[in-house]
């Protein structure tokens, strides 16, 4: 097994294969970002605030249609609160105005009240630039891996270690 480490060419080849896999994944992510016009075209539902529409761990695919069509009441959007890097998935419940100046109020389907307390300080509504994208599709429970990795940091280290060992010890 460890004989592959003795051959520097084979070790370099395996390292390059691993780098190729990582760069391909990155390019696919960036390509999807460009096509969807969203900085985060795929997000994971982190809480139960949108149940029963979406469960914790669902993987959501986003599309940012602000050029073609306006965000409407009833649409499920993902937004980021200014100054925080946490995507929030909620439904637009009220809209004031039209176009890029429209003000939007959101609420989780499973929440009692609207999201005003979640917005940034001195912000009563969302504007279109706060929206990361609208939900167009989802895959149930696939995102649980992300939740597990964030809740149990040791699991992330173990998975990276196992993947590294597989790459190093792989025989071709």
Curated annotation (Swiss-Prot):
- A GO BP term, please? protein targeting to ER
Instruction: Using the UniProt record, name the top-level EC class of this enzyme in a single word.
Output: hydrolase
Give the EC number(s) under which this enzyme is classified.
3.4.21.89
Active site per the UniProt annotation: 49, 90, 115
- One Gene Ontology CC term in the entry: signal peptidase complex
Task: Provide any one GO MF term from the record.
Answer: serine-type endopeptidase activity
Question: Ranges in the Lumenal compartment?
Answer: 36-172
Keywords from UniProt, A to Z, are: Endoplasmic reticulum, Hydrolase, Membrane, Protease, Signal-anchor, Transmembrane, Transmembrane helix
* Membrane-side (Cytoplasmic) residue stretches: 1-14
Lineage top rank: taxon: Eukaryota
Tell me which InterPro entries the record gives: LexA/Signal_pep-like_sf, Pept_S26A_signal_pept_1_Ser-AS, Peptidase_S26B
Question: Where does this polypeptide localize?
Answer: Endoplasmic reticulum membrane
Key word Transmembrane helix present: yes
Q: Which residue ranges does the record annotate as region C-terminal short (CTS) helix?
A: 158-169
Q: How does the record classify its membrane topology?
A: Single-pass type II membrane protein
Comment field on protein domains? The C-terminal short (CTS) helix is essential for catalytic activity. It may be accommodated as a transmembrane helix in the thinned membrane environment of the complex, similarly to the signal peptide in the complex substrates.
Question: What's this protein's family per the entry?
Answer: Belongs to the peptidase S26B family.
Purpose = Catalytic component of the signal peptidase complex (SPC) which catalyzes the cleavage of N-terminal signal sequences from nascent proteins as they are translocated into the lumen of the endoplasmic reticulum. Specifically cleaves N-terminal signal peptides that contain a hydrophobic alpha-helix (h-region) shorter than 18-20 amino acids.
Name of this protein:
Signal peptidase complex catalytic subunit SEC11
């Amino acid at each position: 097994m460890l004989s592959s480490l003795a051959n520097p060419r084979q070790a370099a080849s395996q390292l390059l294969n691993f780098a190729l896999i990582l760069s391909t994944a990155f390019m696919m992510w960036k390509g999807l970002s460009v096509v969807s016009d969203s900085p985060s075209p795929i997000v994971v539902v982190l809480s139960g605030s949108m149940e029963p529409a979406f469960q914790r761990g669902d993987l959501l695919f986003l599309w940012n249609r602000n050029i073609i069509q306006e965000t409407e009441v009833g649409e499920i959007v993902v937004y980021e609160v200014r100054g925080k890097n946490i995507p929030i998935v909620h439904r637009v419940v009220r809209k004031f105005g039209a176009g890029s100046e429209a003000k939007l109020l959101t609420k989780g389907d499973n929440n009692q009240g609207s999201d005003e307390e979640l917005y940034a300080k001195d912000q009563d509504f969302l504007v279109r630039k706060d929206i990361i994208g609208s939900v167009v599709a989802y895959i149930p429970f696939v995102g649980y891996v992300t939740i597990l990795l964030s809740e149990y940091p040791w699991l992330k280290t173990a998975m990276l270690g196992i993947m590294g060992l597989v790459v190093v010890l792989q025989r071709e």
